[in-house]
A protein has these predicted regions:
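A charged, well-structured terminal subsegment
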Residues: 102-132
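Conserved active-site and cofactor/substrate-binding residues in soluble primary-metabolism enzymes
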Residues: 13-20, 38-42, 72, 76-79, ...
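Proline/glycine-rich low-complexity loops and linkers
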Residues: 92-100
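Glycine-rich phosphate-binding loop
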Residues: 42-85
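A short helix->loop->beta-strand "cap" motif at the edges of active sites that frequently abuts
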Residues: 87-91
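Generic secondary-structure signature for well-ordered alpha-helical cores
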Residues: 23, 27, 49-52, 82, ...
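Active-site rim loops that border cofactor/substrate pockets in soluble metabolic enzymes
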Residues: 23-53
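Glycine-rich phosphate/diphosphate-binding loop of Rossmann-like nucleotide-binding domains
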Residues: 1-34
Length: 132
């Protein structure tokens, strides 16, 4: 498994527990890819770049505590991240839902494993839903 870390500037120290847990739970291929962004809203573009331009299996987003972020910015950011999940089938987990790094890593691994299992079961059973 490969993972991308999107980190809001100033929160780089929050990643070590998550990375340690990922390495303990999985066979991480190569290094975890890190991208640091200047603010909360910029995490959306970084996560989209991971989904669109790399081969990572999931993205872990390290955000400041919800109480320290302007509510409109946080809502817009989480909406943007959710859209990436839906558009790209890319598991994205955030420190808003999982403030503990180990929990964050476990959630990412759980979602990747679920996605792999569901994709494997669906192979050969895909229904064409296109309209003529």
């Amino acid at each position: 498994m490969k993972f991308g870390f999107v980190i809001v500037e100033g929160f780089e120290d929050k990643t070590s527990t998550a990375e340690h847990t990922l390495r303990r739970l999985t066979e991480v291929e190569g290094e975890v890819e890190y991208r640091t962004v200047p603010g909360v809203a910029e995490t959306v573009l970084a996560a989209k770049c991971f989904a669109e331009l790399t081969s990572v299996d999931a993205v872990l987003v390290f955000l400041p505590a919800a109480s320290t972020v302007e509510p409109a910015v946080l809502t817009t950011t989480l909406d943007g991240l959710t859209n990436i999940v839906l558009d790209w089938n890319m598991p994205i987990v955030t420190t808003i839902s999982y403030p503990d790094g180990a929990q964050l890593a476990r959630a990412a691994v759980t979602m990747v494993n679920m996605q792999i299992e569901m994709e494997n079961k669906a192979e050969g059973r895909m229904v064409d839903t296109s309209v003529n």
